[in-house]
Amino acid sequence: MNIIVAVDSKWGIGRNNGLLFNIPEDMNYFRTMTKNKVVCMGYNTLLSLPDAAPLKNRINIVLAPQGVEREDLIVVHSLNELFTALKNYDDDDVFVIGGGMFYKTMLPYVKNVYVTEVYSDGKATVFFENLSENPDYLKTYLSEIKSYKDIKFRFVLYENLSPEVYSFS
């Protein structure tokens, strides 16, 4: 399982239930990495998408409160239900795409974290764990530094050296 996330210079990821930056190359990277794959998200992330519609050309799984049901995506109401649903897919094809609480919950279980590091302060109110300070995560890939307008960024891969296995309760 993987996480894909864009962070600012303070490891911020969002503000007002939205993204901090709109960088076309990062959006293309997200599309390329997740197309024809499984994307898992929390309910607020789904609501933040245009028309709260599932992402096209992907299997969408949403962890949502009890009572929420949708025909156009897979809705689960607990981590047990989520991990049961994920048994149907190859672990390498699963991407956790947010939001903040869902990232925090899923981080121990993922093998790879694909991070777009943006070297700017996005004035975030929601943050991701700073993996560069966590000894359980090894930085294994760094792209060259890129720029869009006045924003500098790069793509980084962190590998979880000891991912946990979910234990059903």
Residue ranges and their predicted role:
Residues M1-S169:
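Enzymes that bind and transform nitrogen-containing heteroaromatic metabolites
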